[in-house]
From Swiss-Prot:
The lineage of its organism: Bacteria, Pseudomonadati, Pseudomonadota, Alphaproteobacteria, Hyphomicrobiales. Pathway: Purine metabolism; IMP biosynthesis via de novo pathway; 5-amino-1-(5-phospho-D-ribosyl)imidazole from N(2)-formyl-N(1)-(5-phospho-D-ribosyl)glycinamide: step 1/2. This is Phosphoribosylformylglycinamidine synthase subunit PurL. ATP binds at residues 53, 92, 495, 532. Its EC number is 6.3.5.3. GO terms for cellular component: cytoplasm. Keywords: ATP-binding, Cytoplasm, Ligase, Magnesium, Metal-binding, Nucleotide-binding, Purine biosynthesis. GO terms for biological process: 'de novo' IMP biosynthetic process. The gene is purL. The keyword Chaperone does not apply. Its main location: cytoplasm.
Length: 737
């Protein structure tokens, strides 16, 4: 927007910047005058939902954020958790939803770039990435294009940067037709005594610009991300950033090299709202002012205005407060890596955010009110209405369970994601232990003979729509369960809360109750939230997405040689169900996709049972009793058995308990359950241990033959199951199987 800095501020201009009239009035009272055009843009960026969390902050404060291994919780670029031996894991999940819908390749690519910068800004070398993707209905005309662009963008950036993508999720629903979700997670490893923070310290110290040059790409991106879409979506294309993974790789190496010299006082990546957000956050956290001279900014386009420079979201850039005596060494390092290094300002003691451009002062604002004292709202909310219970006995049984299982395996939500993850380099760096497609990604920890880390991300949006509180609990529980199924002890989590317009009380109610559920589960499971992101206004023409509070977590494995996978079972192993037999069909994919029923409550999450069963499974893995483990979630027992058969290439002969109706036992999505493939010689020890710990076990059958054969219920060969499972995605994307 080419508007002069002294232009009159009109109601139209205020609305264009996403500010409410009362917010603008607050600005006038705060500064005692009309803001300049650049100042208006700065307030718009810092006070929007994306940067200030003004609608969610009250509720986010209720989440558990502390734990025995937590070094740094929310409030920094990423969370930091102790993993022993003087090392820590640094991790976070963030959304890039709106940009990825507008421009899928660059939106997804820069989402990866942004989350990687959050990690190495803290002094950690990125070692793993996962992503949680939600697309519209497969038959929507834009869906295939969006899937192709997003997956290519993620692969293009992460592969070139050199970080393995070790897992993730892909789901489809018509409620994402006009607003897809791209949630990106990254983790890095650092030394505990070498963590770097964004809090500026010291007066009169140099503020340094690092990395790539500034262009006009992404101007207004943070404000765009805090508004719902309408029919003018294509006009927002210039707000999408453009990424360069090779420059980011150089930036990583330069930053880590400089950090090793102990030259860095504070550092912040330029993400949402670019230079504005990074400088304001550094100053506000340190109770310092910041003065910038925009004439010192390296730019790649001519005649850029102060507004454009301050709000550009050009990628691969950092802001740093540097020890003055290290200036020459620091400059030499960044120039060696082909990056810009420019001293663009200084810290001050007056708590003002002052910006100079072409010899004139274009910004002079109170820095605290821009940063950590931005407006916070207690928005009205309506408690979600409870759904009627769908009893399994009231659901008519179908005639052919084998056909139903094949249909689910060949569906958009349950089919193999091989087409997706084979476009990612999952083994770069050489530490990945498990191929994507299982319960969790697992990597070895460098400089440690035995330790490994496990990663998972999870949420079931249809549960959250039916009951946000129970859905929030379930998202945490399934993430915790997936990590446990590898043998890892869950340590901590990060959240990415994706919802619609919080100004609608029913949407705000979804957010409130989901956070309550997440908080309860995290407390009970000792799984604190150490970082996260909130993405609101995920609506198009007033239609909201499904509430999608994604939870990603990290676990520690003491001996990576003991890791088990979904596909590790051996002939003769005994298949055991840990937990109760299936009985709950409400909100299951079986009733949704086979019977076209979308009613009922989601399954209740018994957190005591989750904790007890998860600890038991980790214990038997550590004792070496089992060859394989799998959590039971979407699709219930039948899908879990089929996936173990497909992943191992071996058959299972089993029988049902007949405690519940057959369709409920097969497809019920009751929580807190696992399948394990136990070594025959360990069965008696397993039973003794289960009795001691009061664990419910059901012996289902044995690993034998070349089919999944459930007595008097279904019999499907490994090849039939595999063909159904592997064929949907390539066919959808136009490739032969």
């Amino acid at each position: 927007m080419s508007v002069r800095n002294n232009s009159a501020i009109t109601p139209e201009l205020i609305a264009h910047h996403g500010l409410k009239i009362d917010e603008y009035q607050r600005i006038l009272e705060l500064i005692g005058r009309e803001p300049t055009f650049t100042e208006l843009g700065i307030f718009s960026a810092m006070w929007n939902e994306h940067c200030s969390y003004k609608s969610s902050k009250k509720w986010l404060k209720t989440l558990p954020t502390k734990g025995k291994c937590v070094i740094q919780g929310p409030g920094e670029n990423a969370g930091v958790v102790d993993i022993g031996n003087g090392q820590c894991v640094v991790f976070k999940m963030e959304s890039h939803n709106h940009p990825s819908y507008i421009e899928p390749y660059q939106g997804a690519a820069t989402g990866i770039g942004g989350i990687l910068r959050d990690i190495f800004t803290m002094g950690a070398r990125p070692v793993a990435a996962i992503n949680a993707l939600r697309f519209g209905s497969p038959d929507h005309p834009r869906t295939r294009h969006l899937v192709s662009g997003v997956v290519s963008g993620i692969g293009g950036y992460s592969n070139a940067f050199g970080v393995p993508t070790v897992g993730g999720e892909v789901n489809f629903d018509k409620r994402y037709n006009g607003n897809i979700l791209v949630n990106a997670f990254a983790a890095g490893i650092a030394k505990i005594d070498s963590i770097f923070y964004s809090k500026a310290q010291g007066v009169g110290l140099p503020v340094v610009y690092l990395g790539a040059k500034t262009g006009r790409d992404g101007v207004g991106g943070a404000t765009m991300a805090s508004a719902e879409f309408d029919d003018a979506i294509d006009e927002k294309r210039p707000t999408v950033q453009v990424g360069d993974p090779f420059t980011e790789k150089c930036l990583l190496e330069a930053c880590l090299e400089l950090m090793a010299l102990k030259a860095v006082i504070a550092i912040q990546d330029m993400g949402a709202a670019g230079l504005t957000s990074s400088s304001v956050e550094m100053g506000a956290k340190g109770n310092l002012g910041i003065e910038l001279n925009l004439d010192k900014i390296p730019v790649r386009e001519e005649n850029m205005t102060a507004y454009e420079i301050m709000l550009s979201e050009s990628q691969e850039r950092m802001l740093m407060v540097l020890k003055p005596e290290m200036e020459k060494q620091a400059a030499a390092i960044f120039h060696k890596w082909g990056l810009d290094f420019s001293i663009i300002g200084k810290t001050t003691d007056d708590l003002r955010f002052r910006v100079l451009h072409q010899g004139k002062e274009v910004v002079n604002l109170p820095i605290k009110e821009l940063g950590d004292e931005a407006p916070v709202y207690d928005r009205p909310w309506i408690a979600p209405s409870p759904k009627a219970i769908l009893k399994a006995e009231e659901v008519k049984e179908i005639e052919n369970f084998g056909d139903a299982l094949l249909t689910l395996l060949n569906s958009a939500d349950q089919s193999s994601r091989r087409w997706v993850y084979e476009q990612y380099d999952t083994f770069i760096q050489g530490n990945s232990l498990v191929r994507p497609g299982g319960d969790a990604g697992v990597i070895r920890v460098d400089n440690n003979d035995k330790h490994a880390l496990a990663f998972s991300s999870d949420v079931t949006p249809r549960y959250c729509e039916a009951d946000p509180y129970e859905g929030g609990k379930q998202a945490v529980a399934e993430c915790w369960r997936n990590i446990s199924a590898t043998g890892a002890t869950p340590l901590a989590a990060t959240d990415n809360l994706n919802f619609g317009n919080p100004e609608k009380p029913e949407i705000m109610g979804q957010l409130v109750f989901a956070i309550k559920g997440i908080g309860e589960a995290c407390k009970e499971l000792d799984f604190p939230i150490v970082s996260g992101n909130v993405s609101l206004y995920n609506e198009t023409n007033g239609e909201s997405i499904l509430p999608t509070p994604t939870i990603a977590g990290v676990g520690i494995i003491d001996d990576w040689l003991k890791v088990v996978t979904v596909g590790g079972m051996q002939d003769g192993d005994i298949i055991i169900l840990v937990g109760p037999c299936g009985s709950h069909l409400g909100q299951s994919i079986y009733v949704r996709d086979i019977l076209n029923i979308d009613t009922g409550t989601p399954p209740h999450v018994d957190l005591q049972l989750e904790k007890k069963n998860g600890q038991f499974v980790r214990d038997v893995i550590n004792r070496g009793f089992i060859h394989a483990a799998h959590d039971i979630s979407d699709g219930g027992l039948a899908i879990a058995l089929a996936e173990m058969v497909i992943k191992s290439g071996k058959g299972i002969r089993a029988k049902l308990s007949n405690i519940s109706p057959r369709h409920a036992e097969l497809f019920g999505e009751d929580q807190g359950r696992y399948l394990i493939a136990i070594k025959p010689n360990a069965l008696n020890s397993l039973k003794e241990l289960s009795q001691t710990n009061m664990i419910s076990l059901t012996e289902l059958g044995t690993v034998e033959g070349d089919a999944l054969d459930i007595k008097d219920t279904l019999s499907l060969s490994v090849s039939q199951l595999t063909q159904a499972y592997e064929s949907w995605f390539p066919k959808f994307m136009g490739n032969s199987t």
